[in-house]
Amino acid sequence: MKAQPPLRLTAQAMAFVLAGGRGSRLKELTDRRAKPAVYFGGKARIIDFALSNAMNSGIRKMAIATQYKAHSLIRHIQRGWNFFREERNEYLDILPASQRVDENRWYLGTADAVTQNIDIVDSYDIKYVIILAGDHVYKMDYEIMLRQHCETGADVTIGCLTVPRAEATAFGVMHVDANLRITDFLEKPADPPGIPGDEANALASMGIYVFDWAFLRDLLIRDAEDPNSSHDFGHDLIPAIVKNGKAMAHRFSDSCVMTGLETEPYWRDVGTIDAFWQANIDLTDFTPKLDLYDREWPIWTYSQIVPPAKFIHDSENRRGTAISSLVSGDCIVSGSEIRSSLLFTGCRTHSYSSMSHVVALPHVTVNRKADLTNCVLDRGVVVPEGLVIGQDAEEDARWFRRSEGGIVLVTQDMLDARARALN
């Protein structure tokens, strides 16, 4: 009998995506949606990057744990990720926080989100589990990381990257030896330790963990019985493994998917208004830092059935144009000028208006003679005629959310409050 080719490692693995976080540093952008459901790049949601990485890596079994403001996220997954077929041994389960039998609590922490769904993970009949954060933007081949995990015999393998020490307070920070074995792990330290020989930077966790499922399963059960645990991977489980087991680091640069267009590995947290705006605006550069045009590593998402973008009017001072910008389907640029901006699906910009370095989420309307610079417009915002943003910092801060970096977040609630105050 002809020998069968060996299974890919990812065929024996599942991705467990933690997608329940609010992302409070994004302020009003997450008032109505969880951070993983926040829009990114013209048509995608942030969670699409983790799911696409898993899909492109060969993983066909996924579970998504949701909690905060989950409706828009669940609807997006149902619409855009509904092609998994049980007949092909493919699964994508959405696991909302719920009070299960004999329990009266929601997810208590990142580890507890997995613990409460042990029976579901068991049903997948997998050998490895890859724990993923659903709120980061990057392209990564998880199979390379999984292969390292198997070759080293680690209890856990943690994805890591180098970040400036000043930014490392938001991450788990680790020390490693010459063989990438983790010797110390601190979750979100107030004073992050630097890398020996490179004290300006720290080695930060990406929130990506690879485990043998049998090992993690036992660890989760013991953690659930510990009254002193916060039931969190970064605070409880990972430090315990570093101390008592074998924890290995995996450098993101070893598995980052790059096309040659990017000059360095790309990973963004987009956890603040400034970071969110910058990462979107970066896509308008002549040579973007993140290549979304890679047909070998597509970012899968829900695609609405909409007509192409349209540009109308061609008279002096009333010409529908977009320069160094991304304009999505169903947008109509009518006699207005768009520069270095990103328009999501279904936006309308009217005559004599101008936009520069603006991120407009779906179904935004910009009325006549508006002049907008350096701002983020939330979904469905209707910008009134003649509104000016980005020229007077004091006036911007009076009505809207102005970030430390000078980026202005505009929501419909803010515009309505402004209209009531001025009338």
UniProtKB/Swiss-Prot annotation:
Enzyme class label: transferase
Metabolic or biological pathway, per its Swiss-Prot or TrEMBL entry: Glycan biosynthesis; glycogen biosynthesis
Keywords: ATP-binding, Carbohydrate metabolism, Glycogen biosynthesis, Glycogen metabolism, Nucleotide-binding, Nucleotidyltransferase, Transferase
Keyword ATP-binding: yes
One GO biological process term: glycogen biosynthetic process
GO terms of molecular function: ATP binding; glucose-1-phosphate adenylyltransferase activity
Residues holding alpha-D-glucose 1-phosphate: Y107, G172, E187, K188, S205
Annotated InterPro entries: ADP-Glc_PPase, ADP_Glu_pyroP_CS, GlgC_bac, GlmU/GlgC-like_hexapep, NTP_transferase_dom, Nucleotide-diphossugar_trans, Trimer_LpxA-like_sf
Catalysed reactions listed for this entry: alpha-D-glucose 1-phosphate + ATP + H(+) = ADP-alpha-D-glucose + diphosphate
PROSITE patterns (alphabetical): ADP_GLC_PYROPHOSPH_1, ADP_GLC_PYROPHOSPH_2
Listed Pfam families: Hexapep_GlmU, NTP_transferase
Keyword ATP-binding: yes
EC number of this enzyme: 2.7.7.27
Similarity annotation: Belongs to the bacterial/plant glucose-1-phosphate adenylyltransferase family.
Self-association state and partner proteins as the record states: Homotetramer.
Function description: Involved in the biosynthesis of ADP-glucose, a building block required for the elongation reactions to produce glycogen. Catalyzes the reaction between ATP and alpha-D-glucose 1-phosphate (G1P) to produce pyrophosphate and ADP-Glc.
Name of the protein in its database record: Glucose-1-phosphate adenylyltransferase
Species per Swiss-Prot/TrEMBL record: Cereibacter sphaeroides (strain ATCC 17023 / DSM 158 / JCM 6121 / CCUG 31486 / LMG 2827 / NBRC 12203 / NCIMB 8253 / ATH 2.4.1.) (Rhodobacter sphaeroides)
